[in-house]
Amino acid sequence: MNSGEKIGIITCANATIEMDCCAAPCLRDLNAHLGSFAEHHENPPILAGMITCAGCPTLAYPEKIMRKVGALVEFEITTIHFSYCMVAMCPFLNKYIEIIGKEHPHVRLIKGTHVSSLSHEQFREYVNIACKNQMNMNDVIKRRVTERS
């Protein structure tokens, strides 16, 4: 990787829009070169842009993410990281990777952003509890959601 490589992050539209996630853990680990960004530690990347996915349901038309990805590619990104929440929750992630990879084979696609002490199953359960209790992603991130919430 060259110094100053331009990367993009795709976050989950539901987590970002419906649950008010500001991507703070993603950005924290980007800046600290942790999680999926650890491989960039010798040549810190430049975050060229962040977008949300195309939203659910995209089973019938997953290609709609390509318009959003096009906005990143126009700025010459070389790598796209899919956020932790997408890796943990998105039933369309592999389809997105297939479609983006076919259209933009020069762009590296990496599953994940930040480190989490929660398993994907625990994360999904906490998000489910947060949704039922009208909480947001900050409640999940800051661990204000428990099995008893």
Give the positions of each predicted feature.
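Short, aromatic/basic amphipathic alpha-helical patches
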Residues: 93-103
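Conserved mixed alpha/beta catalytic, RNA-binding, or beta-rich assembly cores of soluble enzyme
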Residues: 1-72, 86, 92, 107, ...
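N-terminal cationic-hydrophobic initiation segments that often serve targeting/anchoring roles
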Residues: 72-73, 101
